[in-house]
Amino acid sequence: AVYLLRKYKYGWMPATIMLICVLGTYQSYISIAIGLMLAGMIVDLIKGKKADKVIRSGFLCVGILVGAVVVYMLLSHVIYPNLDNESYGGVGNMGQIEISQVPTLIGRCYKRFLEYFLWKPFAFVTKTSQTMNILVCILAVALFAYLVWKKRLYRKWMELTLCIMLCGFMPLAVAFIYFMAPEVDYSMLMFYGYTLIYVLVLAMADICMAEWEQNSGIGLKKWTEYSRYGLVIVTAVVVFISCYTDYLVTNKAYLRMDIAVSRVNNYFNRIIASVEAQDDYQNGDDVTFV
């Protein structure tokens, strides 16, 4: 959806339809779409796109997102008339967030994002994964600062201000599921959008490499050239290790959950088998556990 929106003049039409399907498939995926939109605008500004054009693109993205959400909610109530009575995950209260809750929910998004990457990740997150996430954040800031200097973005105050604002919105975008589901415990939510932080870091490293290749004919000191590619290698290694540790953590967590569920099922099967083995037990009798 985001690709079509950025690539074609009338790409907003299929993009809107796709985003409606995205919401219908799994609401957590919308965070990825919002994050990709923001990341694309950040990259555009770094590459030299004018602020007014990026602002127009931003308004178009907001309009598409709002339209997709509204249509999705209407279709949800048509397809599932009893949706308002559904209690699972707070689905029945979808779209009923009070204005007074908005600042708190926005703060919740930033808090959970910072906790995951910097302060206090989940208990199952390993020390290696936490360290790599901290390094990813440091690299993101370092690469952004370098590109602002290299691209002379500090001379264009409108573009620089807008770029910093969009970077500030990035945590809100990738953690937007915390805003959408205020009644659900944070440990039960899926935050796929967090992976876009790694993608954004790699995108900035890619811009750096393109800039260096363009100026490769200019005489450079050896240490400068080595430090450049050393930065790229470090970025690639850190992002790879972060993704790999996330892969391990996720699979181990689901494996532990599967083992726990199997044990509970086996335990209750033994209890039921023991009850049914009683001489005076009749099929359909009420059983009370004390």
Where would I find each of the regions flagged by the language model?
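Membrane-interface alpha helices of multi-pass inner-membrane proteins
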Residues: 12-27, 32, 38
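Hydrophobic, aromatic-rich transmembrane alpha-helices
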Residues: 122, 126-158
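Luminal/periplasmic active-site loops of membrane-embedded glycosylation enzymes
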Residues: 84-121
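Perimembrane helix-loop-helix junctions
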Residues: 33-66
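Hydrophobic/aromatic-rich transmembrane helices and adjacent perimembrane loops
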Residues: 165-210
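Short hydrophobic alpha-helices at membrane interfaces in multi-pass membrane enzymes
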Residues: 4-20, 49-59
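Membrane-embedded, lumen/periplasm-facing catalytic core of multi-pass transferases
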Residues: 238-290
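Signature aromatic-anchored transmembrane alpha helix within multi-pass, membrane-resident enzymes
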Residues: 209-248
